[in-house]
Amino acid sequence: MLIFQQQAFALPSYARQTGEACVACHVSFPELTPYGRLFKLSGYTLGTTQLFPVAAMAVASVSKVSNTQGNDSSYPRNNQLQLEGGSLFIAGKLGDHAGMFSQWTYNNLNSTTQADGSTAFNGKTTVDNNDWRLSWHLAKADLDLIYGLTLNNNPTVQDVWNSTPAFGYPYQSSRLASVWGIGPQATLIEGGLAQQVAGLSAYAFLNKNWYAEIGSYRVADGPFSFLSHGVDLSNRLSGNNPYLRFAYNRDWGMHSLAVGVFGMDAKVHADGTDTNSPLDHYHDRGIDMQYQYLSDPHIFTTQLSYIHESTDWDASHIGNDRATANSKLNSFRAKASYWYQHTYGLSIGYFGEHGTTDWTAWSNTGSPDTTGYILELNYMIKPNWRVGLQYTGYTKYQGASLNYDGNGRNARDNSTTYLYTWIAF
């Protein structure tokens, strides 16, 4: 499973609802400020109800892989201007205690592999991230409690800190890189269940310091199928699967700090198309940290996360795509950003995957280990219009820096330059 495919945007519909500028809620999209976190935890209910809480966005880009090794057909649309697609959002206050974030996305770079090995592109519209909330606020002299329920379709999409996977860095990345099969391996909670599940959680935020959330996820079918509309259930859950999140938050002066833990246990059918197929058991545990210095004109933010995944594989895998009945995968992410006047941005990121040696799963090197870095420059033409230049460099790929595939391809050959622009309206 590959990562670096999430996209997230600030919504003009929320700005119209609250009467606030985009920078009130966001450091840089989608990094939330303390006010933005309270807005989300309050169920998107701050402000006045809008008759049409609708917004949209569009993305165009150019992606260039470092080296095709003369095999250009394996990297279709390399170094070509592309309209990636766009999204429609229904997002805003539904009532005093109810609000929503619902995204539907048209992917113009949706691809399929043909019988002759070529790649065909065909646009496709599917459901994207959804977060529907009920919330209440209890305020007294010595007590400030926000509590509520969230129904969502992507574990951690409901989180208000940008150190967990769904809204973690990179916030924008090349869709073509995933078409080309380029990207680090990922734990299940890092997007493996996105738009395939329905989760219900109860949460509470006490005195703007302590956050707790307990929930459960199941497959998004039957009455919940709208949460997976158009998406293949490649990782079909069995039964109810617990999710936990705890964090400590402190805001003082221009500073904001949060540290937390999160985790999920998941029973996943070995064959997503067969509800009678055997089950694989995933155990994902994460720790995370976020720090923000929110001044004017200087802003600095950083996020860290570490996820440990242990997977118990059904016996049907052994000798086929796995050598052992249990494997482990560790994922580390770090990112730091600097913004000047909310207009000029620089971000530096690091990613590392380290897993169990398995010569059946990784026949060339025996290892999924992948490491690399991300450098990104941003310019905000307007508060709702961004231009970005991003470089993702690989120092190790699937267990090796050199000749990782046995055919002479090196890790650095997968490094990708990504020039993009997006606009929300």
Task: Say what each PLM segment does.
Residues 21, 379, 409-425:
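Outer-membrane beta-barrel "beta-signal"
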Residues 33-34, 41, 54-62, 76-222, ...:
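Outer membrane beta-barrel
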Residues 62-68, 108-114, 140, 155-161, ...:
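Gram-negative outer-membrane beta-barrel proteins
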